[in-house]
């Protein structure tokens, strides 16, 4: 948390909310890939992603892409967002990579491949 107040705020592909934007549930939230041909997620089976237990609510910034989204009470929120910046890219993963929110996600068969592609996208 706190990215909206950090030095990186203007570089992010999302706009962080000014209030406590942590959303949690023991039932979990459904995940859906919006851009399956995006280099970061190409070839991953998003239909098998188990529900995530929480995320940081935000909005996609102008010029950013929502690659993967998460649903809460009928509303969709960015889960994986990305934007080009200079010669590179900035990516935000709006949930945890640790067992707290991601315990189910860590059991996803494509978990390792996801992280590998996140840092080394297929071109």
Description of each model-found segment:
Residues 68-69, 92-94:
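Short beta-strand segments
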Residues 68, 81-84:
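Short acidic-hydrophobic surface loop/beta-edge motif
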Residues 1-74:
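An acidic, glycine-rich "communication" segment
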Residues 74-77, 84-89, 95-123:
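Extracellular ligand-binding/catalytic regions of CAZymes and related secreted enzymes
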Residues 64, 90-91:
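A broad, low-specificity signal marking well-ordered, structured residues that form hydrophobic/aromatic
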Residues 3, 80-81:
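Mature catalytic domains of secreted/periplasmic carbohydrate-active enzymes
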């Amino acid at each position: 948390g706190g990215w909206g107040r950090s030095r990186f705020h203007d570089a992010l592909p999302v706009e962080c909310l000014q209030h406590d934007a942590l959303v949690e549930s023991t039932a979990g939230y459904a995940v859906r890939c919006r851009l399956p041909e995006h280099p970061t997620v190409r070839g991953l089976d998003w239909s098998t992603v188990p529900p995530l237990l929480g995320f940081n609510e935000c909005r996609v910034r102008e010029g950013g892409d929502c690659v993967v989204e998460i649903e809460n009470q009928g509303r969709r929120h960015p889960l994986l967002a990305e934007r080009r910046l200079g010669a590179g890219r900035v990516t935000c993963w709006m949930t945890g990579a640790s067992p707290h929110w991601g315990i189910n996600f860590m059991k996803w068969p494509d978990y390792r491949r996801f992280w590998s592609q996140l840092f080394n996208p297929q071109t």
